[in-house]
Amino acid sequence: MKRFVLLTGCFCTLFAPLYGQDNHYESLQLGSKNALLSGAALSHWVDPTAVVHNAATMMDAKEAGIAFNSTTGGFDNIRFDNGLGEGVDIKTSDFQLYPGLIAADLPLFKQANKYRLGIAIFARVSDRTRFTNRSTRIQNIINDVEMPGSETYIGQYTLDIDVRETTAAMGWATRLSEHWSAGVTAMTLIRNQRYRENFNANAIADPTLSPTVDVVSSESDISMKLNYILLQMKGSLAWKKGPWNLGIVLTAPAMKMYSGGDMIAQIELTNIRPVDSLNRRSYFASAYLEKLKPKFKYPVSLSVGVSRSFDDLVLSAGGTFYGNIDRYVVVDPGNTSFLQPPTEDNIIFTQRFLEVWASNRPLVNTSISAEWMLNPRTSLMGGLRTDLHYAEFIEPVPLGFQLPKKIWNRYHFNAGASLNGARSRWIFGVQYSHGQADDYRQPYSFDGASESNLLQGERSKGSIRANGVTGIVSFLFYVNRPTE
């Protein structure tokens, strides 16, 4: 039993916090016009994507329409200076082609003035992040009795995250009175998450100095995939009087319909001498968890938007409150043996290493926007919105793994133009995003590596910056608008 208590302390220093998903609610906005207007669809009808933002505003649509939208491509750059130690940066530059969407709102039979139906299929999350770097240096890590002089230290780190979420929505709206309308939307979310993190470090002796130990090494490798099907409901109200529009949307917490996945994890310590031990030996931990039933939660949210029309200008503002989610277990490893060989004693430590958990803090995202009509066929649009991270970054970091990775706030700035034809409309625009955290914690450190810390240095904090530029294009076809 003493051996496993000792190993628990060792392995906890080797396993970094696990991060793995896009950590923002509003990174991808549905619909090009709504994206350029930073969420103005909360308060008034913008295009057929209203079924997702505020179904009640569909009652203000003057004709049936089908929208084809695509954020055609985006370039993202994330940089963490000295993220793995002095002179060892963590950085990634990635160009992605984002999936498009289709949305439509249609009158129900001949009751267009009383009822409307909307449908949409779109990408709610599309996030890929990959960090990798390697450091080679000469330093004295192992005692000179066993490894005389300095050793060659080689450290490597890789993090690869891929999160995709596709949503299908169907909504219905009805007119309650001259000024009020109501709507309801049901959304089915299909979420797929892939994660891999690897760290390995080696202290290699100089063979010319007759060492008694040739190599000391440590490695941790964890990989998992998690799949979900979730159901989420929205209820909405829209009020319109003169130049003013008001929208209110209540979104219920997501309900799990299906989940599955697997995880494989491994730790190897070779010729290591843990603290308070006089002997060197090698240790091994490995587990494969299959047929998992992971959990994932979206919180309750309440959105309010308001807009006012002037002669050639529409100004909009909105905000969304997201409730908190207390710490919950995403993946429970159960009684799987991790430390090898398996015994009755080491099962109790598995949960401390392999349990995956999450916790969401409450937050409010806000937005403002303007649309200026140059003429009946052309308008200019612009806006900005906040996109705050929702993870609770707990210090000190508890045992087990936390899901989110991008623990920094983001801010989106949008600009574009709308070109209207007889029965169609084109929208072109661009979005610039910026995020930064000045107290971001290193996942690992190569500085001052020591054997007592399993060939790692003490992790510190630094500044991480993220910038992105995304192109936005959409085409809207009006089904029943008469040609001019």
Located regions from the model:
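Short, Lys/Arg-enriched, disordered terminal segments
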Residues: 1-5, 483-484
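Sec-dependent N-terminal signal peptides
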Residues: 4-14
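Single-residue recognition of alpha-helix boundary sites
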Residues: 13-14, 65, 189, 253
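N-terminal, post-signal peptide beta-strand-biased segments of exported outer-membrane/organellar beta-barrel
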Residues: 18-125, 254, 406-408
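Outer-membrane beta-barrel porins/channels
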Residues: 21-30, 34-35, 105-484
